[in-house]
């Protein structure tokens, strides 16, 4: 569905242009609506879902018993802190300042198409992740059976 890496520049109002290649698909899948939330696994990164996929993720998470602290924290970070965004006539979305500041996105960002969602990274965090991944040398046994 979504794939690829795109350098993004946010304007002074925190708006970013969604790449043209994705706009038609987003329009068809969710009437130009995206849901923005925090990535609980990586600092410096936000997740963007088309509305329908977000509803699946949200519903799956919200049926979990919140008596467990980790479930409650995930529900708060993912669902409680989510924001519904709509593409404007120029194909832009406005990233809330609270989300931008939490992941240190100022002007420069990187948008990654990750299949069922996008990851929106601060440029610095994305660069650091790439450097760390390349320098680790060992990506773990989980990739041994993957044909690349």
UniProtKB/Swiss-Prot annotation:
UniProt-annotated location(s): Cytoplasm, Nucleoid
UniProt KW Transcription keyword: yes
SpoVT-AbrB domain boundaries: 5-53, 82-125
A GO molecular-function descriptor: DNA-binding transcription factor activity
Principal location listed in the UniProt entry: cytoplasm
A single Gene Ontology CC term: nucleoid
UniProt key word DNA-binding: yes
Biological process according to GO: negative regulation of DNA-templated transcription initiation
Organism domain of life: Bacteria
Keywords: Cytoplasm, DNA-binding, Repeat, Transcription, Transcription regulation
Similarity-based family: Belongs to the MraZ family.
Assembly and oligomerization: Forms oligomers.
Listed name of the protein: Transcriptional regulator MraZ
Organism encoding this protein: Xylella fastidiosa (strain Temecula1 / ATCC 700964)
């Amino acid at each position: 569905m979504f794939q690829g890496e795109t350098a993004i520049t946010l304007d002074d109002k925190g708006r970013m242009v969604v790449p043209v290649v994705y706009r038609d698909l987003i329009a068809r899948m969710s009437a130009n609506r995206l849901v923005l939330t925090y990535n609980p696994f990586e600092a410096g990164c936000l997740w963007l879902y088309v509305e329908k996929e977000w509803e699946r993720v949200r519903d799956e998470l919200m049926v979990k018993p919140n008596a467990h602290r980790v479930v409650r924290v995930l529900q708060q970070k993912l669902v409680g802190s989510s924001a519904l965004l709509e593409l404007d006539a120029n194909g832009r979305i406005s990233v809330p300042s609270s989300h931008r500041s939490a992941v240190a996105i100022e002007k420069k960002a990187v948008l990654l198409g990750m299949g069922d969602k996008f990851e929106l990274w601060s440029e610095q965090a994305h660069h650091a992740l790439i450097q760390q991944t390349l320098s680790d040398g060992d990506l773990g046994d989980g990739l041994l059976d993957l044909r690349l």
